[in-house]
From Swiss-Prot:
Membrane topology: Peripheral membrane protein
Domain Dynamin-type G per the UniProt entry, residue ranges: 89-330
UniProt region (G5 motif), positions on chain: 278
Any single Gene Ontology cellular-component annotation: mitochondrial outer membrane
Glycan-linked positions: N280, N388
Segments for region (G3 motif): 189-192
Span list, region G2 motif: 127-128
Signal peptide per UniProt: 1-20
Protein name in UniProt: Sarcalumenin
Entry similarity comment: Belongs to the TRAFAC class dynamin-like GTPase superfamily. Dynamin/Fzo/YdjA family.
Species annotation: Gallus gallus (Chicken)
G4 motif as annotated region, ranges: 254-257
């Protein structure tokens, strides 16, 4: 009898154990296949990454020799607040994640890098979880870097962030992860936008910091949750900052499998209705509808559509990675164009000031008259008569009131005086970089030849192929 009772107890225990395991298996979500992600981003390829060290060295030399002298002489950084460092020239492409709180930005990064259920994964949750600007970059081992260390390291591209103060640096964190994708790209996760919170409560200029990252991002993902489309004043401010960057913006309607088909269509229309006043361009940004996390899609949803949308987004990301060197050269060339226009404007202001000054004139009153009404003296119209100057590249007239408010006109020299016997003229050097050296360097990448900036034999001095992913 005792043996029978013991046998019954053993059988009951096994049944209970089996039931518990079944419940545990049923409660654990099934993971999605990642082969499409690895194939699209070419993470399985064993070939080494393209070595652009020679091109980067030449690009850095062109910048320091031909662009930076004019940039410093006419204090361009005080107008645009965008100082280019060596770290920025050599940096990897940056992908920026923006959007309201708890829409899945951190979860999306975890999914792209396969960090879920690993010690490396970013913390996620239903509540606002990310209060820092988190830079996820490549490193030999898992390592966390404080913001003050990142800003102090001149080899990185984040040293200019010191200007936002110590309060911000405490909210900046870097994470190094040994991942193949991070060898070619850097991800930046941002704090979620909370409409009912004043940005002043953050203790640092949140919008200015966002603008800094926006100006340097190669691809910008603006993520939304279909269950809470909260488009308010703070999000409106964000899209105002994104103006002019429409070609880099990708809008993501995340967690799409959490809604039925009809509800998803309504949300899709509501999203466009809300964003239409904020994006005033003929061709709207691309919108991706999917669920970017590692678990299987919910049953009875458009799985094939979501998968195709995800692959399209991955192809977009891969294009930015493949074109990283072309983007870098195009960005430096565009920067050089703006520096040249700024120098021409300052030179014209100075020349007009000298022409209007007499022995009995009050210099301050004369220049105030010029700055208040530059059109009266044809300042900007005269610049448009110069070669290769577009009216769409001209800075705002109001910006020069502030610029000359802190930079006296008498502290500048005319462009004709910015020449030396050995070094040549600053203006001629930057024009040569814009029209010959940088286009030649760009052409040498596609042809796989060593850059030759002494002639136009390789690509000619004509127009370079259009790159729709380049920075504006």
């Amino acid at each position: 009898m005792k043996r029978l009772n013991l046998l019954c107890c053993c059988v009951a225990s096994l049944l209970l154990l089996g039931t518990a395991e079944e419940v545990e298996d049923a409660s654990e979500p099934t993971k999605r296949d990642r082969s499409h992600l690895e194939n699209t981003l070419k993470l399985n390829e064993d070939k080494p990454a393209d070595d652009f060290s020679g091109v980067l060295q030449r690009l850095r030399k062109i910048y320091h020799a031909s662009i930076k002298p004019l940039e410093q002489s006419y204090r361009y950084n005080e107008l645009r607040q965008h100082e280019i460092t060596d770290g920025e020239i050599t940096s990897k492409p940056m992908v920026l994640f923006l959007g309201p709180w708890s829409v899945g930005k951190s979860s999306m990064i975890n999914y792209l890098l396969g960090l879920d259920d690993t010690p490396y994964q970013l913390y996620t949750g239903a509540e606002p979880t990310t209060s820092e600007f988190t830079v996820i970059m490549h490193g030999p081992k898992l390592k966390t870097i404080e913001g003050i260390v990142m800003a102090a390291d001149s080899a990185r591209s984040f040293s200019p962030l010191e200007k936002f103060g110590q309060n911000f640096l405490e909210k900046l964190i870097g994470i190094e992860v040994p991942h193949k994708l991070l060898e070619r790209v850097t991800f930046v996760d941002t704090p979620g936008i909370i409409e009912n919170r004043k940005q002043q409560e953050r203790g640092y200029p949140f919008n200015d910091v966002c603008q800094w990252f926006i100006d340097r991002a190669d691809l910008i993902f603006v993520v939304f949750d279909p269950t809470k489309l909260d488009v308010g004043l703070e999000l409106e401010m964000l899209f105002r900052q994104l103006k002019g960057r429409e070609s880099q913006i990708r809008i993501i309607l995340n967690k799409a499998d959490s809604l039925a088909t009809q509800e998803l269509m309504r949300v899709y229309g509501a999203l466009f209705w809300s964003l239409a006043p904020l994006i005033n361009v003929t061709e709207p940004p691309r919108v991706y509808v999917s669920s970017f996390w590692p678990h299987e899609y919910h049953p009875d949803t458009h799985k094939d559509l979501f998968l195709k949308e995800e692959i399209s987004l991955l192809e977009d990301l891969n294009q930015v990675i493949e074109n990283r060197m072309e983007n870098k050269i195009a960005f430096i060339r565009q920067h050089a164009i703006r520096v040249r226009i700024h120098a021409l404007l300052v030179d014209r202001y100075l020349q007009t000031y000298k022409d209007k000054m007499t022995f009995f004139s009050d210099g301050e009153l004369v220049f105030r008259d010029i700055v208040e009404d530059p059109d009266k003296f044809f300042i900007f119209k005269s610049i448009l008569a110069k070669t290769n100057v577009s009216k769409f590249d001209l800075p705002n007239r109001e910006a020069y009131k502030d610029f000359f408010g802190i930079n006296p006109i008498t502290s500048f020299k005319l462009l004709s005086q910015q020449c030396s016997y050995m070094g040549g003229c600053y203006l001629e050097k930057i024009e040569k970089a814009i029209t010959r050296e940088l286009p030649d360097l760009l052409g040498s990448i596609g042809l796989g030849k060593k850059p030759n900036v002494l002639s136009c034999d390789v690509t000619g001095c004509g127009e370079t192929p259009k790159n729709r992913y380049k920075k504006p």
